[in-house]
Amino acid sequence: MRVGRLWIGPPWEDPPADALAVVVDPGRAFGTGAHPTTRLCLEALLELEPGSLLDVGCGSGVLMIAAALLGYAPVTGVDTDPAAVEAARANAAANRVEIDARQADGAGAPLPEAEVTVANISLEGVVALQPRSAVVVTSGYLVSERPELPGFRHEIRRQLDGWAADVYRRESQ
């Protein structure tokens, strides 16, 4: 899958020579990179100013790896599934990028601070977040839904195949 200058695909496919390649073997974890919500989040990351990044519900690490290749640093990801954390770490190593993947409950425990938070999870999960970031990219829900993030103003909505992603900026920014 090509998104701007990024290419996301499995290890058995060859990326285009002009692309930043995100090679992903999902293993038992969620996330091959092909879902419309992943594409929407990647489009948002391509347009934002890189800084520190937190990926809530990191799955196989697609968004974290892409962010690291785009210059975001440091990159941290949390997921409730230990198989996802293991897959994210393995995929990051295979892509030669540095990330910090941790098992954590994003809705229950305090989240690490980052300039940008990306959350490609259910609408309920997005609403439960209390991010401490300047910018929040949300997805994982239908176009008929839109999360409300107190203290943030809505900036951009993207839609693809019935799915949506939104970019929010902290009110004081």
Task: Kindly give the residue locations of the regions a language model identified.
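Surface-exposed, flexible loop/turn segments at secondary-structure boundaries
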Residues: 14, 61, 144
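Short, charged/polar, Gly/Pro-enriched secondary-structure boundary elements
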Residues: 16, 172-173
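Conserved SAM/SAH cofactor-binding pocket of Class I
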Residues: 28, 32-107
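Non-catalytic substrate-recognition/targeting regions of SAM-dependent transferases
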Residues: 1-32
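S-adenosylmethionine
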Residues: 43, 80-169
